[in-house]
């Protein structure tokens, strides 16, 4: 009876947490889209984790002599990003206050990303190997910025958190250890 009560309380708590965690991250603004997301982790937590990861990437690239090796290319990216950053308030007013940063890593990889909180990273390979114009760079950068503005990383972390919580509840119901429950997952 006690186990059933505990399980019921845990399931109710998980349900309440899930329902209260659904929210929108951006205004419909110019895009006219209002999408509900499961957001159980705070923006501040995600931005802090992103800043730590971004700084680690910068330190590693700097130590290997791969950070911002082409100043003209870096300035080009900063100019493009400044034009795009000027528009973020249309989609998400608080993003205009983010501490935006732009860096390049010398690598042949075709990659670029924008982390929560406005941490922009371009690998030189995507620019050089594809011989991108400013407009093409802006399209890639804008696309990556949209992931940060729409908080896709926060949503992904929240889903992982909900999954782990669900595994914990299931383990409790069936009397499994956390390891057994994760193995079953």
Predicted regions and their residues:
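A Zn2+-metalloprotease active-site environment signal
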Residues: 2-185
